[in-house]
């Protein structure tokens, strides 16, 4: 709407031009609650000096460490990495995510990874339920923003980045039971292409009583209350 009168010095839309080279494309995505993203795709020349180059293959990738958490009893160790006051404000999935990730980094001898790639099938179910319950009980006028901010799938990966001061590549894959597979595949791509030397890969999920009842209706039983896997992958020296 209104594209016939573009903003001065702004981007002028077009209905399509022929015989015009396209080297850069800006893609925008706008979601509920300000969960927006922008992706800039650019075509580089083959002689680009700044483009990363490497001769690595998948055989050169090493797993420096692996940590797996499968029960809430395993979370007691989190006080070694995070202050008790902060821990009390975290849900069980966030605790599991932070503990497995920080412990894996410690075992690998890495303070700040070059990239963080996270997989999750269901995201932060506990906080999502609390948000929906609050909407049902209190309407949409005076909702607490905390439940929403801590219910999105990419909350986990973002919090790891904040804790480790990682400003590199950060993405979340939500591909059901294949989420970890997709996260590892992306990590291998970064390592083989020489973009990163170390990548923290994780897959984190939780279940709630309500969720377990719903899943039992479709024949899925014995879901773990929490389940986290964290890996540190590396390539090169």
Protein language model annotation of sequence segments:
Residues 186:
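Internal active-site segments that recognize and position negatively charged phosphoryl groups
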Residues 1-169, 174, 181, 189-196, ...:
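Conserved "HGTGT" condensation-loop signature of ketosynthase/thiolase-family condensing enzymes
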